């Protein structure tokens, strides 16, 4: 039994290493899946990580048509095949020297394992000294599109050198781009390669010369230059950033982002990441000295991280700061902790969770980032907030629970601003003083969930107790006590029935359900005019509002109620596929008495009678067409308060068309609050070309909010996107124009501005998988910023 020839692992790591430069965006191989232009072994096994890991312990089998020579120098000829695990080596002839451990393999030398396929003319070397030479190599990565050639490979142990090597993810017969290097050194011990005098070619044209560059060949990170980011916008002019990655240690690194903006000057942006067993954190800071457009120094800072204290407790922090209220608009920063365009939230706290409880101690602070507003637009700072929630099922029909928190509220004074003749906003000198206070809110409850095979009845008895200790200033504004108290019971009864039947519609078999639901709520009236409004507003009326025990988001108001919700949902489920083709829901609240509690005097009281009708429709016409609609009809004023219609059509495997109409009425004065249309698409013109666009228009303001138009050319190894964008950049309606051009060399990297974030936000379904992410609201706003463990 002879040792297996070590022809592959080191030299072909060059090929794998080049593909390791791949961008982190999801590659799209849909137009031309990975093919194997080189002939492989028919008996090659599939990818099995257990076989790969056990290679050194497996025996090597050698066979051929003939065996001649001597015991010292056996010669295998004719269809020679050496096999070990997933590794196969074939040649026309293999001569070995058992004393010196040398070998020569000639004629149609082929090597294949679960990750790569290699064809060469000749291989020779010495197993004892671990010196090898392979001539005229062609290689193909299996499962990825990487392929290329090399004139020769010299191996000395774990160090190797290739000569006249190429790499591309295109088909070998139609290589649109290719990376070529006359010399590449590879060090498997250190995990990096060095290419000298490398040339990046597009077609037959060299477009980039790199006299020397270093790159990783495995998952270990290496210090070096990342690919540049280029762009142009009306705000900044020509925009160039050159990221520099610093691999400082296995568990922490840094990235520098020197950036030049034609209209503003130079900016330095830095990011530092730290990872350890019990947590991780990252920080980012930017500074631009003497911004030429604002004539002042500007900057930002952010920090985000967590530390696992034990199995139940975790410390988390999310901090963000900008130097001025125009920073967000000018630099479109994606700060950690960014919650809106008008403000930034910083949060720090300790949070715990158990089988039946959650608890935490946290504090936050808000910073104004919109120059057209004053601090009155900010939420109250919670400094601190202590909360404890408990939910314990005792029996199948008995459940106890508790919601509780104590919060100290603070707020910055508001410095009023006014629009000047030159279009700038300046402070007027007027100041609105803000005062705070401390609030304790406790809500214990007991629930009795009775259920049957097709019904449920759940009575719930709760009590809400809220007490305050207010600053004297806010108590005087409310003409009340500094220590107001509110205490009241909350009683609800939630019940429903599930009915179904078999039915046939247009020859298709369906399971049709009828799901009526009844929700009764009783809360007695308590005068709450002496209570402040720290963190409480009215919920937007929707389907979910039909079944809440309060129509307000916070504890500062608890509405009185004597009401009954009547609602029903009906579904049509295809019995062959199990898919829900149609769902209809409609509901309304019956008010048995006037509701006297309001947020303020301007809020209209709910009168005895009927609420707005709420209806939702979801219709999956087929696998391509989807229709959704929400409609609210106010029977008291005989008007529609809200309407939303959304249609989606899927084209092929990648294309999509979205149509939407949104209308909302201001329920306080009956005026139209929002009226918009939204049309977006990714339309495949042919297998290579596709058009992209969005037209987002305000019918109320009679102006577009965002216009996007572009073309993209997509092949198996290259994508080119050109995007023209005009969008509203601030609350005052100022527009900005930009041109974005991106070249995506699939399996390598991209050059230009990152168009993905803009297109994924503007065109829901630009990446088809985004349609199925949860929650969709996070996806449509900013997919890359979605945090499933967001700090409460």
Curated annotation (Swiss-Prot):
NCBIfam families documented for this protein: PRK04423.1
Signal peptide: 1-22
Lineage: Bacteria, Pseudomonadati, Pseudomonadota, Gammaproteobacteria, Lysobacterales
Originating gene: lptD
A Pfam family this chain is assigned to: LptD
Disulfide topology: none
Protein name: LPS-assembly protein LptD
Keywords: Cell outer membrane, Membrane, Signal
InterPro entries: LipoPS_assembly_LptD (IPR020889), LptD (IPR050218), LptD_C (IPR007543)
Family label: Belongs to the LptD family.
Subunit note: Component of the lipopolysaccharide transport and assembly complex. Interacts with LptE and LptA.
Signal as UniProt keyword: yes
Function as written in the Swiss-Prot or TrEMBL entry: Together with LptE, is involved in the assembly of lipopolysaccharide (LPS) at the surface of the outer membrane.
One term under GO cellular component: cell outer membrane
A GO biological-process term: lipopolysaccharide transport
Membrane among keywords: yes
PANTHER family: LPS-ASSEMBLY PROTEIN, LPS-ASSEMBLY PROTEIN LPTD
Compartments in which it is found: Cell outer membrane
